[in-house]
Amino acid sequence: MRLTFVILLVFLTILNVLPHLSQDLSPYDTGLYHQHIVEIIKQEGLIIGSANLHDRIGFNNSNFYLVAVLEKLIPFVPGHYLLNPIVYFGTIAYLISLIFYLPHYKIAYKIIALGVIISISLHPLFIVSISPDTIAYCLSIVFIFKILLKSPGKSLHFEFLLFAILITVKFSSIFLALMFVPFFLGRNRRIYFKKLSEYIFICLFVIAPWILSNYLISGFVVYPVLQLDFLSPEWKLPLSLAQSHMETIKSWALSQGLGNAKYTNVWQYFFNWYETYSVNNIHGSFYLISLYKLMLPFLFIYVLSFLLNANRYQKLFEFVFILFLINSLWFFSAPDPRFSYATLLIFPFTIFSYSITKLFNKKSVALSKTIILLLILFSMARICFIDFGFIDKMKAPKIQTEGNWVPTKYGFMTFEPKADQCWDVSIFCNPYKNRNLKLIDGDWKKIIEL
């Protein structure tokens, strides 16, 4: 029976993954700096001050190290067909296993899992790519479900490990720290506080090496977070550049360069965002906006039910409120859906699941079987979208980057691309054509700006 389930699990997961492999959804940033970073890691491991070539190298997303390792181990398969599809496969498999294995009294979580599977199957972000966004939202989905399903008093070691990894992949995942709050304020808080030192150690064990590499690459603890600026090595990026980058990230997330990024109050901020994402389908925005419009009446019912019977729904309400808070922090910091795709999807389905379980309260077994049937039918329908043309795409030649080798004032030969995308043409690609760079060659290569 167990073997049969494993075969079914793998089969359904494959049906949900295969349709995406023929779609190269690599974002523009892959050519801009993603592939450049991977090439640096493969050839040198790390170049001190390499962010002086391109400041976005300073983001130092840890997934690029994994991509580099996989490309070394499996050189005949392009990197964008390796890490992200594997992580996406694992996430879908995990959600499917929840639908099959969770007991009937946890039917609400099965509904949420089904909603998320359908959502990320129909509206994926960068599956065939090396973008950190994919692994960030996939691992965030797993993290949130592990938190929601955690039994009172049980250890949080794995969840803190996953959280620490997420921080190194995408620093915007820092908001997920709020998911731990109910554990440290609830009835079992003494149990969790006793193990707090262990949780902190796990986080430091993962994050400390990443912070060190951040420092060596850009001179910042976390680039471009200005609040963590207290180091000044000779290779450090200018503070003004970091400040400008933060402003660019927020304004671009608000308008995508298509709408108005200027605002004077909260309402104008909201309307600027809505004007951008309701007219342009950016990172699944059409789907998300429709989902939230549909959710509004259910949200009203949910809040009203909680007020009438707070004790019964306290645990679920705590996490619903935290998801709402995380989404609010996302909205007022950098409101591009790709920065918090997991919480943006899980929040409305949590509200929907409550309403559905209230309606079918006495038929949870039948509802559970219905959810499994819907999962199987949806997965089978995905067969129509499978295109094995991705096999030929995997054999396609590398993108040729046009440009010239030009020396800087200090004799440092860098490659200046005709456009601004470096891809993997050279580890010394210089898209900003900065002629003030100097290379100090030694056991560790170092790039400084004079």
Can you annotate each of these PLM segments?
Residues 12-13, 88-98, 102, 106-147, ...:
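Membrane-embedded helix bundles of polyisoprenyl
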Residues 16-107, 127-129:
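Active-site lumenal/periplasmic loops and adjacent helix-entry segments of GT-C-fold
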Residues 1-17, 191-202:
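Start-transfer (signal-anchor) and selected internal transmembrane alpha helices
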Residues 176-204, 350, 356-358:
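Perimembrane helix-loop-helix junctions
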